[in-house]
């Protein structure tokens, strides 16, 4: 057999052998075996020891069967590799509406090329039970879009099985394709087995356990007759000849061969023919990751690194191309087309040759490659092209007619009778052009099957045929009989094609219409002029076609996939004004007024294709309920969705709940902050969380869900196992609401971030949360700030911290906690080994509480972030903290701003910094440490090698303190951020800092805002930057410089340090 595989270059075929057996007894034995008559066969074998079945052991026959399979699938070294990308599949629970109803391209585009998070199953476990109490699947179904590698997967599995790497429970694997089955009108189970084993010179099957046979049926989408399970008569007789589709239906049902395992591969849309109840296991082949795309292209250009870099750059720069390149077959086609383009650029030395921006432009380059147009000048048609133009046009015309009618009839595999019926000259099918478009394959019935290398090529060729035929046709080209109401002129036929495409429920004409539109774009006309198109003929149609397309953007309640496809068609036509205007409105924040059907459709299109919607689609302050409702079908596929501040009320949550409940839902993060959501809206969202399996982050801050809404969400958390982050900040849930949430945390083991700030939570709520923390094993961050838990609430949480060894971040800001509460918290911190961040801002911690903090910090080795801002530490408390800083070996961030700290405490902290080797951030702003305190800290900077950020805003620092800091910066090589805003360093201080900048190489940000620098001070700093190339940002605002002088200094800084951003 001559077979061409998807990863082989165009025009290449492999010689392979079809394996089988002969002998009436052997066939009967196998059929009986598969039909569930194993015991009878064993008895017959025992009575006939001289038979082939009784004379050879099973072990001796299996190697021969394996050798035959290896011969059939070839010896590609990649097959059988444990690192093969098809070594694992995704377990899925069923087909989604998107898979059942939409074109393969639409599936990839709508999901942004990101596959649904799913459980992964390795190939060696594909047919094994998932648990100890389950049974192996009898019928397995693997789905994947066109070109993703379903046949390659089958070959990979067969190769691995033949080498004993997978499927060790099977003694026989019987692979068969629907291309083979299409050659039969009727077939019995008996003849089916004979057709598989027709060429091995002995009966190679023996009586074995019947469940050790795997029948593989590859390519259900290529079956010429749809499977109709409801209208097919049951048949259990393996000798009875019935229609092939009935035979397959009865095998899947188990009426025939009930003991064997059946594995079917299919495109998603065709897989819907099989009732879900008959499928025991469904898997999906994922597309290529970014790294796998790179590897795929590297394999195409192993010795052309420059070319590889150019192709990769173009793919990564064009979002539409990148998304489709997640499909391996398309990735290879793209590589071939772009490789030819860049070679042509090099040959003609024309770097301005335009790069493809649309699919039609890409396929036009592929056609140029197929026509052999290397070295073609962009202004002229090469002699070689001229020589093949007439023959190519005729061949493409006949192939196009075949492709078009196949597309209309959902036919993707053609046989010799089909080729002859459409006037295809079989003798010419081996030329370069045809080998780039078609692949040829011999079937088991010794006939020849043809199909286009990829479905999209069939659609492109069909579009070229329709484009040419519609100029002279007087009847509807979609009508099989050729008779219809007269349609005169290209526009009438284009309108007909657009109507057919937009009315098709399965989207099978979507990409065809895109290509048909793209053939009218100026670039495509230039690329194909003289070969497939006539020069300039697009000009008279282009604007009118754009009007026709825009006429299909109806004011429907929801934007459907067909409407979005119209935007794709306009993009192919290079008529992008509508999409660009909406995209610009999104960037500028003026989207709120764009509510027309065309604007909504363009917005849905941009959700798929625009970088502005990736990784997050931000629709804050711009959506109404009506617009949101129209976008719902497309919001399903957003990874991250921000809908803040849109005045959404409870009815909108019912709509969003329906989206989150959908099987297709891919939303992982959704923010609904600052809307008007009440408890009814929260309940609607909670109902969706009961079934949703994608959402990991839900932000409901600043709404009004109250205790009833919190209870509904808490009940959902008892069942939901995907949500990891929930924000209920500012929702007035009070103690009653937090009690329900705490109860849910006892059983929920996935929530890791819970935000309950500003919810009027008191002692009772804190106690309930503390009890939950003693049992919860997942929560890592609890945001409890701006409530009223007081000391007793803090004591309850402290008791929980003695038990809980999971929580890492605890925020108790502004909770009326005094020394008593802090003291108990610190005792817990002495034994707790997981808490790394503690926020005690805006409480009432005095020097006595600071003493307890010091004792804890000297013993604790896990706390890294401690925030004591706006407490009552004074010098005595800060000095106590300084003792801990000198001894602690884990703290990295310490915030002491606004604590009435003066020079004495700053001196103690300076001494501690000379000993500390972990602190990277110290914040002392709003403390009157003065020049003396600044000098003490500066002295520490001369020896400290870990501090990165120092905040000294509004710290009463004058020129002397600035001079001390300047001296330290000439020595220090680690400090990157120095903030001196709101001090009074003056020109003298500025000069000292400027001199330091000439020598310092580590500082990246310097803030001298509001420091009375004057003109001279600003000039000192600006001049110093000519010798400093490390500073990235400097702020000189709020200094009495004057507008003209500020402009001059800004220009000077930009000249001296072009990489430095200046605010002045």
Swiss-Prot record:
Quote the record's binding site residues for ATP: 144-151
Q: Which GO terms describe its molecular function?
A: ATP binding; molecular function inhibitor activity; phosphatidylinositol 3-kinase regulatory subunit binding
In the UniProt record for this chain, what is stated about the effect of gene disruption? No visible phenotype under basal conditions. Mutant mice show an enhanced response to lipopolysaccharide (LPS)-induced endotoxic shock. Herpes simplex virus 1-infected knockout mice exhibit enhanced innate immunity and reduced morbidity and viral load compared to wild-type animals. Mutant mice are hyper-susceptible to colitis-associated colorectal tumorigenesis.
Query: Hey, what tissues is this thing expressed in?
Result: Expressed in bone marrow-derived macrophages.
Q: Where in the cell is it found?
A: Cytoplasm
Which Pfam families does the annotation name?
LRR_6, NACHT, NLRC4_HD2, NOD2_WH
Domain (NACHT) ranges: 138-459
InterPro entries membership: Leu-rich_rpt (IPR001611), LRR_dom_sf (IPR032675), NACHT_NTPase (IPR007111), NLR (IPR051261), NLRP_HD2 (IPR041267), NOD1/2_WH (IPR041075), P-loop_NTPase (IPR027417)
Q: Which GO terms describe its biological process?
A: canonical NF-kappaB signal transduction; negative regulation of canonical NF-kappaB signal transduction; negative regulation of cytokine production involved in inflammatory response; negative regulation of epithelial cell proliferation; negative regulation of fibroblast proliferation; negative regulation of inflammatory response; negative regulation of innate immune response; negative regulation of interferon-alpha production
| Spans of repeat LRR | 338-362, 570-593, 632-662, 664-687, 692-715, 720-743, 748-771, 776-799, 804-827, 832-855, 860-883, 888-911, 916-939, 972-995, 1000-1022, 1028-1051
Entry GO CC: cytoplasm; perinuclear region of cytoplasm
> What keywords were assigned to this record?
ATP-binding, Cytoplasm, Leucine-rich repeat, Nucleotide-binding, Repeat
Q: Could you give the subunit structure recorded for this chain?
A: Directly interacts (via CARD) with TMEM173/STING; this interaction reduces TMEM173 trafficking to the perinuclear region in response to interferon stimulatory DNA. Also interacts, but to a lesser extent, with TBK1. Interacts with TRAF6; this interaction results in decreased TRAF6 'Lys-63'-linked polyubiquitination, but leaves 'Lys-48'-linked chains unchanged, promoting TRAF6 protein degradation. Interacts with PIK3R1/PIK3R2; this interaction disrupts the association between PIK3R1/PIK3R2 and the p110 catalytic subunit PIK3CA/PIK3CB/PIK3CD and reduces PIK3R1/PIK3R2 activation.
Q: What does the similarity note say?
A: Belongs to the NLRP family.
Chain's role: Negative regulator of the innate immune response. Attenuates signaling pathways activated by Toll-like receptors (TLRs) and the DNA sensor STING/TMEM173 in response to pathogen-associated molecular patterns, such as intracellular poly(dA:dT), but not poly(I:C), or in response to DNA virus infection, including that of Herpes simplex virus 1 (HSV1). May affect TLR4 signaling by acting at the level of TRAF6 ubiquitination, decreasing the activating 'Lys-63'-linked ubiquitination and leaving unchanged the degradative 'Lys-48'-linked ubiquitination.
Domain comment, in the record's words?
A: The leucine-rich repeat domain may reduce the interaction with TMEM173/STING.
Could you tell me what this protein is called?
A: Protein NLRC3
Gene transcribed to yield this protein: Nlrc3
